[in-house]
Regions:
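A structural preference for long, well-packed, hydrophobic secondary-structure segments
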Residues: 3-18, 39, 62, 66, ...
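Glycine/Thr-rich beta-alpha phosphate-binding loop at enzyme active sites
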Residues: 95, 102-142, 178-185
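N-terminal active-site wall of soluble small-molecule enzyme domains
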Residues: 11-21, 25, 31-84
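Catalytic cores of alpha/beta
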Residues: 18-23, 57-65, 96-108, 152-169
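Active-site glycine- and acidic-residue-rich loops that bind
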Residues: 10-15, 88-99
Length: 185
């Protein structure tokens, strides 16, 4: 179950607190989506921060200071690469970005975070089945790299992702249904 990570996209602090409170006790890590609005309060669970802002340098450092166990960015810079000394650094790759453009950067990070939806920043978008080929390509070139996949994951597709060697499944709107299907057996 450590492979299934709930994604939280909060609109304000009370929404963040409410969503964290709804996470099952067995979950040890949450994934917080960070948009342009800075929403933060102390939470009682380990978290990683997915930085989807225009100024990733500023926000990535801030979330590392707040205790993020991992930070995911979509653009690498020297400032961000230095964060690797303080937390796990992930490279987010949007679904519509050609993998070939990002391959040189993969060796510089601790893990890659492949988006499996066409549009980031909102939950509930449909799963893009083309992610399966993207995972295979990454595995061929980087057999040891940790891979997380984010977006549209549900009871119909999660097992195939795990079978392809995905290390973490980041699940937003479908988390409760997937979690319940796996824990209520």
């Amino acid at each position: 179950m450590n492979k299934i990570i709930p994604a939280i996209l909060a609109t304000d602090i009370s929404d963040l607190e409410l969503k964290v409170a709804q996470i099952p006790d067995e979950v040890k890590l949450v994934h917080i989506d960070i948009l342009e609005k800075d929403i933060y309060t102390d939470i009682d669970i380990d978290f990683e921060a997915h930085i989807m802002t225009k100024e990733p340098d500023k926000f990535a450092s801030l979330w590392v200071e707040r205790g993020a166990k991992g930070v995911i960015v979509h653009k690498l810079s020297e400032n961000i690469l230095h964060l690797k000394n303080r937390t796990k650094l992930g490279l987010g790759i949007e679904f519509n970005v050609p993998l070939e453009e990002m391959l040189p950067s993969i060796a510089k990070v601790d893990f890659i975070h492949l988006m499996s939806i066409a549009q980031m920043g909102e939950q509930g978008h449909p799963f893009e089945s083309g992610i399966f080929d993207r995972i295979k390509k990454v595995r061929e070139k980087f057999p040891q790299v940790e891979i997380s996949v984010d977006g549209g994951i549900n009871t119909d597709n999660y097992q195939k992702l795990l079978d392809l060697g995905v290390n973490k499944l980041v699940v937003g709107s479908g988390f409760k249904k997937l979690w319940n299907s796996l824990t209520k057996k």
